[in-house]
């Protein structure tokens, strides 16, 4: 069983953390994030460290212990450094560009795909075949990247589609004559 929860979270300089009415708040140079704490969890701030511990030994308390610690750690990292995911667009004529507050993609359909960029997320296209999603909230950055990828998932025969830059596509051999 994992014991992630027992390790305290280091708070870097430039990040302010507080607990107000059962809500953990992290403020940094990139923004502010809030996390409502479960009733099964106690959090304590001391010496630039955040400690999380369960209330009692019930199963829900032990389950939320490590989860809450991981969420707090990602919040602290998000407001200080931020998170980013890079997507690659592969295919003949496939490209992406940011126009105003929309991401416009040509992915081989008869129409362009227009994706409205959500608040709190920054999307850039350093090249027509690369999309960079950045933000302070790890979950939202991952969800936006997944939404963009789902418009044209990579197919296994030619590898065309939108994929994460770290993702490897398992290729299949075409049919033989």
Curated annotation (Swiss-Prot):
UniProt biased composition (Basic and acidic residues): 156-171
InterPro entries (UniProt xref): Ribosomal_uL6-like, Ribosomal_uL6-like_a/b-dom_sf, Ribosomal_uL6_a/b-dom, Ribosomal_uL6_bac-type, Ribosomal_uL6_CS
Keywords: Ribonucleoprotein, Ribosomal protein, RNA-binding, rRNA-binding
One GO cellular component term noted in the UniProt record for this chain: cytosolic large ribosomal subunit
Top-level taxonomic group: Bacteria
Biological process per Gene Ontology, one example term: cytoplasmic translation
Region spans: Disordered: 156-177
GO molecular function: rRNA binding; structural constituent of ribosome
Annotated function: This protein binds to the 23S rRNA, and is important in its secondary structure. It is located near the subunit interface in the base of the L7/L12 stalk, and near the tRNA binding site of the peptidyltransferase center.
HAMAP family: Ribosomal_uL6_B
Quaternary structure annotation from Swiss-Prot or TrEMBL: Part of the 50S ribosomal subunit.
Database matches in NCBIfam families: L6_bact
Family affiliation: Belongs to the universal ribosomal protein uL6 family.
The protein's name in its UniProt record: Large ribosomal subunit protein uL6
């Amino acid at each position: 069983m994992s014991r992630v929860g027992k390790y305290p979270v280091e708070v870097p300089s430039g990040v302010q953390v507080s607990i107000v009415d059962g809500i953990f708040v992290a403020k940094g140079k990139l923004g502010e994030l809030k996390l409502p704490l479960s009733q099964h969890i106690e959090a304590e701030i001391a010496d630039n460290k955040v400690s999380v511990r369960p209330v009692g030994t019930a199963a829900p308390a032990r389950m939320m212990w490590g989860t809450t610690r991981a969420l707090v750690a990602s919040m602290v990292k998000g407001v200080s450094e931020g998170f980013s995911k890079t997507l690659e667009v592969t295919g003949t004529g496939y490209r992406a560009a940011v126009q105003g507050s929309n991401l416009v993609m040509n992915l081989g359909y008869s129409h362009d795909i227009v994706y409205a960029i959500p608040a709190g997320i920054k999307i850039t296209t350093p090249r027509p075949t690369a999309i960079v999603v950045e933000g302070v909230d790890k979950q939202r950055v991952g969800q936006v990247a997944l939404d963009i990828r789902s418009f044209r998932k990579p197919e296994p025969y030619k590898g065309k589609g939108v994929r994460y830059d770290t993702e490897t596509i398992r290729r299949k051999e075409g049919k033989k004559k």
